[in-house]
């Protein structure tokens, strides 16, 4: 998923930046419209057992390591997700998330446990204005640890207004919320 982005921006790998973790850092300097330069960091979960690391655990580790070592102003979490046609989603349609939640954490008990399990993490306060400026739709991102979906997952997604299914989104938002780092 990241290869076109890496090639477009000409970012180069910073070897062993996160060692001994498998996460990878790619970095370059970009010039903003105001003439100031900024560092663009692209962090990938890495690989293990000859396979790309995917899912909540890998995303949480990579996000935690990145925030602790890089101290970003904002985390932009981009990737490929599934959507629901009934909500207007279509192949290759670009969205900006308006919130992130977990859809596969079924924790019985009182409201506090249920609220904590689902997450419902906010995104960066400028997300709506950015979406309007770019003429992009917004949607609630839901996350689960499996590529498939159980009927009870779909029920949670529908009950909470989920529109986009992305395996890492809420995990990244969770870590950002702990470290008070804005996420888009």
Each model region followed by its residue ranges:
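Conserved beta-strand scaffold positions in the cores of enzyme catalytic domains, especially
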Residues: 40-42, 75, 138, 183
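Glycine-rich beta-strand-to-loop/alpha-helix junction loops that act as flexible
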Residues: 44, 78-81
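Mid-sequence, gly/pro-rich, charge-dense loop/helix-turn segments that line enzyme active sites
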Residues: 80-164
